Amino acid sequence: MTRISRSAYAEIYGPTVVGGVGDRVRLADTLLLAEVEKDHTIFGEEVKFGGGKVIRDGMGQSQRLATDCVDTVITNALIIDAVTGIVKADIGIKDGLISGIGKAGNPDTQPGVTIIIGASTEVVAGEGLIVTAGAIDTHIHFICPQQIEEALATGTTTMIGGGTGPATGSLATTSTSGPWHMAAMLQALDAFPVNVGLFGKGSSSSHGALLEQVRAGAMGLKIHEDWASTPASIDTCLNVAEETDIQVAIHSDTLNESGFVEDTFAAFKGRTIHSFHTEGAGGGHAPDIIRAAGMPNVLPASTNPTMPFTRNTIDEHLDMVMVCHHLDPSIAEDLAFAESRIRRETIAAEDILHDLGAFSIMSSDSQAMGRVGEIVLRTWQTAHKMKLQRGPLQGDSERSDNERIKRYIAKYTINPAVAHGIAHLVGSVEVGKLADLVLWKPAFFGVKVNMVLKSGMAVSASIGDMGASISTPQPVQIRPMWGSHGKALRTSVAFVSQVSLSNPAVSELGLNKRLEAVRGCRGVTKHDMVRNNWLPAISVDPQTYQVYADGQLLRCEALAELPMAQRYFLF
C-alpha cells in the first residue's frame, strides 16, 4: 500500500481527520484555531481537477446526464458553519442550491459517492480553502451603490436595511420611506448581485401609514428615534408586524424624552423585536439600553464600530455621532446628546456579552456609524480579543477554538437569517439553501475573499491582471465576475413581505431578482438564536455605567493592537 505523510496529504487535499484527531487551521493572523471535526471524503478516493488528476471521463467523472449530476462541485473544502460544523467535504450545487455535502465523484467507479460529477459539472478547487455561508448584514444604510462592491469583497451576500441614497434621512436612519421610494429602491437594487431586503419607516402611530409600506414590498419596519421612537409608534408598528409576519428593528430613544428604557420594554408587550446596536453608542436609551440583551423577546445586535473595544474606539465615536445625526457641535444640547451615547464601560461589556452568547447578531450600520466592509473582520477580531483576554470557552481547549468559532460565525450568518425570516434560503451551509458561499484562503480569512458565489455562480473573486497570459499576475484585486452582469443577476433574491406578493404594483416592477417572502418572523425568540441565546439579568449602574450580568461585573481592557489589520492593507 502506498502511504503519504499527513503534511503532504494536507498540502494536496486540505486538512483532514486521522485517528479521531483533526488537523488544525489558523484563521488569518488571529489566535483562533479551527480543528476539523469530520471528513466526508474517503482516503484514496478523493477527487481533484487538473492535468493527470482524478476528475476525468471514466475516472472521477461519470458518463451520466445532467439530470443526475451537479452543476458545480467544490472539492475538498473545509466548511466552517454554525449549523453544519467544521467539516471537510465536497459540496454539490444544483439549480442554484446546495444539493449535497459529502463525497463527490463517479459512482460507477468509486465507493461512497453522494455527489455525482458528469460532463455537465464545473469544478471549483476547494483544497486548502475555507468555505462559509455568505454574510448577512441587517443594518445597511443604502447611501451609495458602491457599498455593495465593498460588501461583496468581504463576503457579504445579503444586505438588509433602508435608505434612498445620500438624503439626510437616509444618512441617519435605515428606512426606505413610503411606497414610491420602496418601488424605486427595489428597482435600483435589482442591478446588483446581492440578496436585498428593505425596511419601511416604522416610526408612526398610524396603522395605515405603516401597512401601506409593507404592502409596497417592505420586508420589515424600522423604528428610529430621529423619526420618533415613542411607546405609541412602537406599539402600532408591532401591531402591523404581528398582522403581516414581518420583523421590526428598533433604534430607541437615547434622550429618554418619551419615556425611559422600562417604558420602551413595556411597549414591546412581550412581542419579538430586533434591537439594533444594543450597547447604545449607535443609539438607544442612555445609559441602559444594553439591558435589552437579557430579554427573551429581544434579538440583540451590535454594529461594528464598537467591536472590539480598542484604544481608538471612544475617540472616533463622537465625530461619528455628530455627523451621522445632523448635530451641530456649537450647540451645547447637541454635544451633550452625542456624549451621552459614548460610554467606555458599556462598550467594554459588549465584547464580553458577545463572547458569552448574550448578544446574538453582528451588523455594520454602513456609512452611518459603521463600516460595510468590516462586519466579518470585526467579528473575528472580537473573537480573538476575547480569547486573548478570557481564555478558552467551555468546550474549547488550548488545542482548538471550535465552540468559539461556531458561536461567532453564527452572529453574521444563521442568526440574522432567523431573525428576519429568511433562514429557509440563506444563513448556513446546508442542503436545500441557496449556494451563497464564500471561499477564503486561511491566511486571508475574514479579510479578503478568494471567491464569492451567488446561487453557485461567481460574482466576485481575487483575480490578477486581466491582460496577462494567466489569471495570477499582479495586481491581484477583488473584481466583479460574470454573475454580476446581465440576467445572471437573477441568482439573487429580493426579500419582501408575504402580503406584498399579492400587490399588482410590486409584480409590475419588472425585477430580475426573484421575489421571496419572509416567513416565521413573529414566532422567533432569543432561544432561537443559534449558539447565542444566553439570557442574563443585565443591570447598569446609573452613576458609573458599570454593567453587571447575573450580578457579575463585566469589565475588559481596550486593546492597542489587533490582528486582521494594517498588515493586510498595505496595498
UniProtKB/Swiss-Prot annotation:
The answer, when asked if Hydrolase is one of the entry's keywords, is: yes
Question: Which pathway does this polypeptide act in?
Answer: Nitrogen metabolism; urea degradation; CO(2) and NH(3) from urea (urease route): step 1/1
Gene3D superfamilies for the chain = Metal-dependent hydrolases, Urease, subunit C, domain 1
The entry's keywords:
Cytoplasm, Hydrolase, Metal-binding, Nickel
Molecular-function GO terms, alphabetical: nickel cation binding; urease activity
For substrate, which residues are the binding ones?
H224
Q: What class of enzyme is it?
A: hydrolase
Q: Which positions does UniProt annotate for Ni(2+) 1 binding?
A: H139, H141, K222, D365
Q: What is its EC number?
A: 3.5.1.5
| Co-factor(s) | Ni cation
Where is this protein localized, as stated in its record? Answer: Cytoplasm
Q: Which residues form the active site?
A: H325
- In the record, N6-carboxylysine modifications are located at K222
Instruction: Describe the PTM.
Output: Carboxylation allows a single lysine to coordinate two nickel ions.
Q: Cofactor: bound how, per the entry note? A: Binds 2 nickel ions per subunit.
- Which Pfam families does the annotation name? Amidohydro_1, Urease_alpha
What protein family does this chain belong to? Belongs to the metallo-dependent hydrolases superfamily. Urease alpha subunit family.
Listed name of the protein:
Urease subunit alpha
Traced from the root, the source organism's taxonomic lineage reads:
Bacteria, Pseudomonadati, Pseudomonadota, Betaproteobacteria, Burkholderiales
The coding gene here is ureC
